[in-house]
Amino acid sequence: MIYNYPMKYRRQFRRLPKHLQGIYYAFLSISTMIKIALDPYSKRPMKWMHSGTPFQYENERMVMIKLSLATVGLLFATRLSGLQFNKYTELKSVAERQQIGQVNDPQQRKIILDHHGDIVAIDLPAYDLYVHPRMCSISLERIAELLSPILDLSSQYLYNRLDEGDSGICLMHQIDTNTSAQIRRLGVDGIELVHHPQRVYPKRGSFESILGYVDTEGYGQAGLESSLDDWMKSTYQDVPCWMDGHGNFLGIRFPKQILFHQESALQLTIDCGLQEKVSQLITNAMNRFGAKRIAAIIMEAHSGAIRCLATSPSYDPNCYGWFPMERFRCWPITDLFEPGSTFKPVNLAIALENGIFQPTDRILDTGKIRIGDSWIGNVGGGFIWDRSLDHLTGTQILQRSSNVGMVRVMQSLDPAIYHRNLIRLGLGSHRNDNQTSFKMSSHDHNESGWNLKDLTSDYAISVVKDQDEFVDHEIEAATASFGQGLAMTPLKLLQLIATIANGGMAVTPHLISKIVTLDHFHHLQSMNEFSLQGWVGQSVLSRSQYHAKQPRPYTHDLYLGHVPVPSLELGWFDVKSIPPHTRERRRLFSRQTCNVLLGMLEQVVLDAQATGSRGFLPGYAMAGKTGTAQKASALGGYSTDSVVTSFVGIYPAVKPKFVTLVIIDEPEDPFRFGFNTAVDVTQTLISEMIVQEQDPPSYPTVSLFERNM
């Protein structure tokens, strides 16, 4: 033992780390044996060898034994030193293969952020509870009694479940960490907790129409979660962790890759605060009007970035199983409707562009007009008009929402030219290149999402009669002039209104703002902008060439990410697959035409007797147009009871920044017109936007009764 050696050796021994003390003692013993072997007949007593025992001279046999032991020890020490210095790396790898295993942790999905960087979707740790009865050390009745208060389930129910088999019985999915900790503290053999992250949506029912939801198997089933399902799943590799002899994870030296494996996050254009307020607003409006459903969209006029997309009734994606499946579809971008009078500004723009109508022209409005065998009339909606104004200007046609006036205007345009203009605007096409980056989910069920990887779409964003039918039947062009007989998605209508608001340039509605890298998680304000100019026509770049490119100023007013092509992660590897809202935009209307229409649409709100007067906000310039359209009947023709009311808004009327659309499906009497339903909702919605943007008044505040007096 070490206490048999002198004090100086004992002090050195104690100063050494524990893993070196054994080696030191071995070498000390070997050196002592060698010393004895070399000086066996020394007369000097070596009392420190056997403290407290009389010294005896070594005989020749003992010398040989000790010399042999010293030689063997020296050989072991030499071999140990050789292995330590010459084969350290090789032996370490062998040991690590035995001591370290791979943790097969379920892949977490990427985080989704709103426009300001607030989290709207995230994976949180959760566990699936499995019980293996044949491995349990106590009775099933006792296990059921222990789990009952923790899981808040009856012990009889749990016992019946446990009695179903011998192994692999799943009692509950995605248990939170607190509950799982209580179960672990039970220390019962045969109970297994399998890590299974849970997708959580902190905003609950505010973002459901956009995000969709993720099922218990980790697959996106609606919205962006479905269309970007492959990309949303993290791509990190299994990471090494220390294991015991039975292959169980020890929990020491927990690798950072498991906790912080997220490479990037998806940031949306949606404003969380605005989205929540609008969601509550339209929910109250739906209850007030007794409507079947209602939707509201706010979009930036120049960029196409959607700041708000809310629907009601909604559902909570955290507990989607409690709601009917029809709520999972984001109908403002998938369902077609006949826009009615909200399409009249687009028709007037076509008329102005083709030179068949001037702003000062007056059109005879007789209240009704005969087209073939059919009569078309105006819908008063309770308004009492001055009958002396039978000859209407373009502004008055919009203020009155005159169907007869619009029919007479568009009768001056050749139906074939009219049809070509509609097709040029992207109507009647099943493809949405340069129009919209949304796409229905490829799943077989009715739940819908969008795909930004494939810019073509198999669903119709609008429907127009074919050219032969449109030209041969006069009634087709007549009904199209006031927004009936053709159909489009609400988002497509808003896209056309945005074209008028921004000066005539086509925009692409989009929801994704940028891909945020891990380095920017805590600093989302500063994101570099890059230019796409110079990339067109180039071949696909390797990642090293890609990152070697020098940044250039981005030419569009859009934040698309930290790289020239916004997201290699989403599969946009060549020029053809660049998102359409980053491409060169084409002009649909002249700026002069758009300025004229903006002035007309502003008067629809400013005039106290116009259909949009209830949307007036004192001091703020706003433009818009109401719409009331009959719904098609399943028996053919139009229903006399069901209507869709809507209002498209442009704010501000001078240098517009936003366009809005409120659409209400099947409101009850007396709320059957756009002027007493959608306009009221839009006014409140614009008020929220003014507060959000902190916009000063555009004009001096005036009273509603002082306008046009």
From Swiss-Prot:
Gene3D superfamilies: DD-peptidase/beta-lactamase superfamily, Penicillin-binding protein 2a (Domain 2). GO terms for molecular function: penicillin binding; serine-type D-Ala-D-Ala carboxypeptidase activity. Pfam families: PBP_dimer, Transpeptidase. It is found in: Plastid, Chloroplast membrane. Its main location: plastid. The active site is at S341 (acyl-ester intermediate). It catalyses: Preferential cleavage: (Ac)2-L-Lys-D-Ala-|-D-Ala. Also transpeptidation of peptidyl-alanyl moieties that are N-acyl substituents of D-alanine. GO terms for biological process: cell wall organization; proteolysis; regulation of cell shape. GO terms for cellular component: chloroplast membrane; plasma membrane. It is a single-pass membrane protein. Keywords: Carboxypeptidase, Cell shape, Chloroplast, Hydrolase, Membrane, Peptidoglycan synthesis, Plastid, Protease, Transmembrane, Transmembrane helix. The chain crosses the membrane at residues 20-42. InterPro entries: Bact_Transpept/Beta-Lactamase (IPR050515), Beta-lactam/transpept-like (IPR012338), PBP_dimer (IPR005311), PBP_dimer_sf (IPR036138), PCN-bd_Tpept (IPR001460). The keyword Cytoplasm does not apply. The keyword Hydrolase applies. Belongs to the transpeptidase family. The presence of this gene in the chloroplast genome suggests there may be an unsuspected vestigal peptidoglycan layer in this organism's chloroplasts. PANTHER family: PEPTIDOGLYCAN D,D-TRANSPEPTIDASE, PEPTIDOGLYCAN D,D-TRANSPEPTIDASE FTSI. This is Peptidoglycan D,D-transpeptidase FtsI homolog. The lineage of its organism: Eukaryota, Viridiplantae, Chlorophyta, Nephroselmidophyceae, Nephroselmidales.
